[in-house]
Amino acid sequence: MGKRDQLKPKANVSSYIHFLLNYRNKFKEQQPNTYLGFKEFSRKCSEKWRSISKHEKAKYEALAKLDKARYQEEMMNYFGRRKKRRKRDPHAPRRPPSSFLLFCQDHYAQLKSENPSWSVVQVAKASGKMWSAKTDVDKQPYEQRAALLRAKYREELSVYRNQFNARKTCLQESATNQCREFEQAESDTTDGSN
């Protein structure tokens, strides 16, 4: 077991588990010489849990909430704050589909109409089997379409990057000019006050 695994926070437990631990301790105090097997003890606990009032259950639910908050806090410290995903630029060109995805797009409606009860996953698996069974000659039209779409994407991407770099340069220059103007205005006011 690694050092990091030893430091990992203990998982939070449910309200029922809090009740079970409390009930076990009380049972041991009241009947120290009595031994119950796991199955028997679990049955007794579940019967007792069903019989207690909502007010009593609320106490254990509060303990579970506190334990969950503790666990989340410790996990945040253990892993650190999660990094937010970088948002995708809506103006950036979208990546083109592969030859297999083009094949799937063409055959999805057909497979779905033949098998209306199939889920998306089942249709995708069937598409994968169909694609694997195809020969290289049969795959050629899809690969050509994918190559055309990739070439178009590369062109759009280079145009987008040029525009992005131009905007970035313009913003940097305008910020530099604003700084110069501010410094100039500041030096004019200090020179005028002397």
UniProtKB/Swiss-Prot annotation:
Query: What Pfam families does its record include?
Result: HMG_box, HMG_box_2
**The keyword Acetylation is annotated on this UniProt entry:** no
* Keyword hit for Translocase: no
GO biological process entries: regulation of transcription by RNA polymerase II
The SS bond pairs are none
Concerning its family, UniProt says:
Belongs to the HMGB family.
Q: What is this protein called?
A: High mobility group protein B4
Query: From what organism does this protein derive?
Result: Bos taurus
The organism's lineage is: Eukaryota, Metazoa, Chordata, Craniata, Vertebrata
